[in-house]
Amino acid sequence: FSIMGDWAKGEFTAAGKKPGVDYYCAATPSNNGYLYNVDSFIFYKTNDPDKQAGQKLLAKLMMGKNFQKVFNLYKGSIPARLDVPMDEFDSCAKTSNSDIKTAGAKGGLVPSFAHGMAQGNTMKAALQDVITEHFNSDMSSKDAANALADSVLQNM
């Protein structure tokens, strides 16, 4: 049993594995929200008109419906755009796409803690220290919760 992100699905697909047969997809840790992580591309500031035009073209192409479809079919994830038709996607992607739309409408989108989308590195390190201590010692859950709250306050 393993919990993986949708990035693993691209590898499963490349290996000829089928969702619902060789592996299963489910929201984790629950179906009340949607934990997300997004890949980002950063364009450095430039005064060169040719470079600016290239940056704009790359951004336009990457966010195009066709690129989003093809890229995500191979990667195993879902498009960043919500208006990309999902008819060629498998059941896992269709469910994930539906889940993100539902969570977004209900305010249930949760940024990834592990990938720095929810907080900066200082806060993440402080919280991980408490979590590590809790799981590797006799620290009670109540004490861990209090220590987490203290860490947040100290690192805001």
Regions found by a protein language model. Name each.
Residues 15, 61-65, 74, 130-138, ...:
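Structured segments of extracytoplasmic/periplasmic soluble domains
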Residues 6, 14, 18, 44-50, ...:
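A residue-level marker of the well-folded mature domains of exported/periplasmic proteins
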Residues 49-62, 144:
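Short amphipathic alpha-helical coupling segments at ligand-binding clamshell hinges
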Residues 36-37, 54, 123-127:
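N-terminal alpha-helical segment
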Residues 10, 69, 125:
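Alpha-helical elements of the RecA-like P-loop NTPase motor core of helicases
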Residues 1-51:
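Extracytoplasmic/periplasmic substrate-binding proteins
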Residues 80, 84, 98-152:
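C-terminal capping/gating helix-and-loop segments adjacent to ligand/active sites or protein-protein/ligand interfaces
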Residues 59-85:
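Periplasmic-binding protein-like
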